Amino acid sequence: MVLIRVLANLLVLQLSYAQMSSELVVGGGECNRNRHRSLALLYNSSGTLCGGTLIHEEWVLSAAHCDMENMKIYLGLHNLSLPNKDQQKREPRETHFCLPSRNYTLWDKDIMLIKLNRPVNNSPHIAPISLPSNPPRLRSVCHIMGWGAITSPNETYPDVPHCANINILRYSVCRAAFGRLPAQSRTLCAGILRGGIDTCLGDSGGPLICNGQIQGIVSWGAEVCAKPHAPGLYTKVSDYTDWIQSIIAGNTTATCPP
């Protein structure tokens, strides 16, 4: 069984930070509060929680399966119980998907582009990250981060985002771990073969960052996170760069790659 890495109906998030709960990366440590400036938190009052990435002053990138009603988007957030002075809250003005029905598969088109209701201002804790110029190289060291579970299968949830490093692996490694994968897909296989480090529940939609560019979007993985020889699957952003840039430029009829 595979696990879509979004947390739903597990917690009711309140507008008061002191009452909010959170989720994070297994095997990582607390992120430096000054080094996740593009990281966004997506949530609603019914308990759906995801990550996202600021790629433009008006645009956030996330996973299609993170679409939710009454979405709120926070940027510049670190400790859920102790808000930063420069953090900003936004709502979606538009959402764009590769498929009109908002469908996706476990290996294709799990991507959502969100236009914010108003631009964000750059600050010490908020700044967009670059889209990829090329796909990441095999064995590249990349960064994962988010408010996702830090233990699995018995999940625990701290108040701060966790960060960790993982490697880009051969796609065949994920095919061996998850037999349902096709021979080719628009996803990246990334993780640590020995296990112990992984994205998990609540990290969906968050970034896989390689060399200062967003190369992947947290999509799905094993039901128990951080198992040996069971890496995570990430939407391959470089395959969608033209679509993303066209939408941002105002071409809302742009189509995704087949």
From Swiss-Prot:
Glycosites: N44, N79, N103, N154, N251
Expression sites by tissue:
Expressed by the venom gland.
**Where is the signal peptide, in residue numbers?**
1-18
Q: Does the keyword Glycosyltransferase apply?
A: no
Q: Tell me the GO BP annotations in alphabetical order.
A: proteolysis
Task: Write down the InterPro entries for this protein, in alphabetical order.
Answer: Peptidase_S1_PA, Peptidase_S1_PA_chymotrypsin, Peptidase_S1A, Trypsin_dom, TRYPSIN_HIS, TRYPSIN_SER
Xref: CDD domains: Tryp_SPc
Quaternary state and interactors:
Monomer.
Described purpose of this protein according to its UniProt entry: Snake venom serine protease that may act in the hemostasis system of the prey.
What is the name listed in the Swiss-Prot or TrEMBL entry for this protein? Serine protease sp-Eoc49
